[in-house]
Amino acid sequence: MKWVSKRLRPILSPPGLGIKPFDPSKQTMVEDPDFYYLEFIKGESRSAIFCFNESGFELLGTSIQSSGTQSLHADDFLYSGNMGPVKPCSSELKDLQTIGEIISSNYRPLGLLGMDYILNDSKVYPLEINPRYTASMEVLELALGQNFITKHMQAFGIKPIYENPARTEPSVIGKAIYYAPHDVLIPEDAPWVSIEPNPRLFSTFADIPKTGSAIHRGSPVVTIFAKADSLTEVKAQLKTRTSQLDSLFHVGTLQNNLV
């Protein structure tokens, strides 16, 4: 049996920070309220989004989640992004509905809630439940053409100014967090410099750093987005944009290194 240790992370820090492999035969458990231990379960990491209201809940969608992605220079279990939506299989959907019912009947939450889980042999193993707007939600919002904050407001009985349009055939959206491969300075020719910010239009970059700013190795640099008709196409687009950033930051050389 494999385990991981997890330290409670600061609020303003990347998801997945503080998670490390743990071998009880070689390491000693720390008696510290900031630490806890989880069994490591192999499988595909996924995210599910729920919206709870007075009468029950709605499963808004699921997506594939990645962490510790080496091509994005993410260490250990650092959050690396999401792709979706993905259609859950029947047993997965049944497990998610059961979990939603347990949460609803025992805790009576209202509004948006995200759950990270491992899908192993079509069985759901919950990892973390977050009663808030989570990093994977914008992927499903962009894919489905929906505003989840509208649903969140409605769950509290607040009438939103903006009503969600009818759902259309979803696109597939990919989101990836590019981490600094080494200490870098943001150059003037970064690919996002020429992009005019417009919240109504799909953009391939977000969380854009200021030109000339210094970012240390392992810290997030920028968020990459991709949009296509299939997961395969989305993966290809994200790979291409990641390679462009590797070239920009001279991965494999000492150029643009602050040290």
Predicted regions and their residues:
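ATP-grasp fold ATP-binding core
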Residues: 2-21, 33-49, 60-64, 115, ...
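Short helix/loop capping segments that flank catalytic or ligand/cofactor-binding pockets
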Residues: 16-18, 60, 70-71, 137, ...
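Structural beta-strand/beta-sheet cores of well-ordered domains, especially the beta-sheet scaffolds
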Residues: 33, 46, 55-58, 111-115, ...
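ATP-dependent carboxylate/phosphate-activation module, predominantly the ATP-grasp catalytic core
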Residues: 39-102, 106-108, 130-156, 166-168
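Short acidic-glycine loop/turn motifs at beta-strand connectors
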Residues: 52-57, 119-123, 181, 228-229
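Conserved metal-phosphate-binding beta-hairpin within the catalytic cores
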Residues: 104-138, 177-181
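Peripheral (often C-terminal) accessory segments that flank ATP-dependent C-N-forming ligase machineries
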Residues: 153-259
